[in-house]
Regions:
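C-terminal peripheral helix-coil segments that are non-catalytic and often amphipathic
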Residues: 124-128, 132, 165-202
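Short secondary-structure transition hinges
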Residues: 89-124, 131-135, 139, 143
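All-alpha amphipathic helical-bundle segments outside canonical DNA-binding/catalytic cores
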Residues: 75, 113, 131-147, 165-170, ...
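Secondary-structure edge/capping motif, primarily at the C-terminal ends of alpha-helices
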Residues: 66, 95-99, 159-162
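Hydrophobic alpha-helical connector segments
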Residues: 50, 64-94, 145-148
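Helix-turn-helix
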Residues: 4, 8, 12-46, 50
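Short, basic, alpha-helical segments at the C-terminal edge of helix-turn-helix-like DNA-binding modules
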Residues: 52-60
């Protein structure tokens, strides 16, 4: 039952945002009583925490799947961007914005997990890019991976880039181009320019 609650809560939180969904909404959606809901979770914050980590785990698996299917690391970067953007809707309902604003402690916990899980994937992609001649062979993999993940954190920080002033899709695309241009070889640049051109046409 607890796993079913987390799965349903995760879906609703993604669709409507963490603040918007109440425990009453969750009980109704699951066709259970609030008493049953509170038997598994002491309060909404506990459920938000478990749901957030459930979603994060799903995102990591999705990124791993993309990584294994992508033809090369540049394609991987842009495919991951598209996958991640679905969690950034408008300012009122975006689960990421609401988590950062209303549950900053949980948001910080998730950020701490990023290095452990995503850092390994990023470093693997950088190594593949070097071995295939798309990324410069002299880049410092540890430095670049940390810089990349910190940059991704930065563009998602609503204190630095308020949603009312900055479009998340544009931020992602600008940052990806900034990151990739710093590490690609001439061969990689040709492929990168194709992806940028295709993105501009959409």
């Amino acid at each position: 039952m607890k796993e079913s609650i987390v799965q349903k809560a995760s879906t609703l939180f993604i669709q409507r945002g963490f603040k918007s969904v109440t425990m009453d909404d969750l009980a109704d959606a699951l066709a259970i009583s609030k008493k049953t809901l509170y038997a598994h979770f002491e309060n909404k914050e506990q459920l938000v925490r478990e749901s957030s980590f459930h979603v994060f785990d799903s995102v990591c698996h999705e990124i791993e799947f993309i990584k294994n299917k992508a033809a090369h690391p540049i394609e991987e970067l842009y495919t991951v961007k598209s996958a991640v953007l679905k969690y950034y809707q408008n300012e009122d309902t975006s689960p990421v914005y609401q988590l950062q604003k209303y549950y900053p402690g949980i948001y910080t916990e998730l950020k701490d997990q990023e290095y452990d899980r995503l850092g390994i994937m990023v470093q693997s992609s950088l190594k593949l890019g070097i071995s295939t001649g798309l990324f410069r062979p002299n880049i410092d993999i540890d430095f670049v991976s940390r810089l990349y993940l910190n940059g991704m954190r930065g563009i998602r920080d609503i204190a630095i880039f308020p949603p009312s002033q900055f479009n998340m899709k544009t931020l992602f695309e600008s940052y990806l181009e900034y990151h990739a241009r710093a590490i690609v070889t001439p061969k990689g640049l040709e492929i990168l320019n194709e992806f940028i051109a295709n993105t501009d046409q959409k």
